[in-house]
Amino acid sequence: MYVRTYYHNNLPGVTSLPHDSLPPAAPERLETLGWNLWMLSGDDIEKQAAEIAERVGYTRPTDKINVLASETIESAGTVEEKVKMTAKLQASKEHYTATTSSVVLIVDGKGHYDIEDPIENMWIRVILTPGVLMHIPGGAHTRITFENPEGYLDVLMWFNVCIYVHKSINPSY
């Protein structure tokens, strides 16, 4: 099994349509942009995802977050609200800039996740299905779309845990 990715054809119209008329995006291209994708399978995808997330430095998972295509949040304060805000932004065909890097597991649902390729000036579309695990770099421009208004995604996210190191301050500077 693999994660399906391809270049969005950028034709006018509804961004939630497949827009699949250009070649696949090579995994090496995504890695160049700071992305890593995995396709997990089996009954233990959450455990597999946690092991991968920890291996790449992400140790703090969230609870499951439900993202609805019809989401209408006015302001985003919590992690869950920020994730849901991406669904709201997709309705206006705008992109969302990831402020911090994270690892995201699709637990249930289906959608499209568009990644900006600033070098090619195009969008790369990732087909989101259960088992897709993504490492999202901070600063990435993305957008999420659903095929229909009833679309949803259940996701788990991991973030870096900040480690503070106490240093003595030398007052003689």
Model-derived features with residue positions:
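Conserved short histidine dyad/triad with adjacent acidic residue
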Residues: 64-99
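Conserved metal-binding segment of the jelly-roll/cupin
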Residues: 127-148
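Double-stranded beta-helix
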Residues: 143-173
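Beta-strand cores of modular interaction/reader domains in eukaryotic scaffold and signaling proteins
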Residues: 105, 114, 127, 135, ...
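A short secondary-structure junction signal
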Residues: 115-118, 123-124, 146-147, 167-169
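Short, conserved beta-strand element in jelly-roll/cupin
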Residues: 96-117
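N-terminal leader/capping segments at the start of a protein or of a new domain
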Residues: 1-70
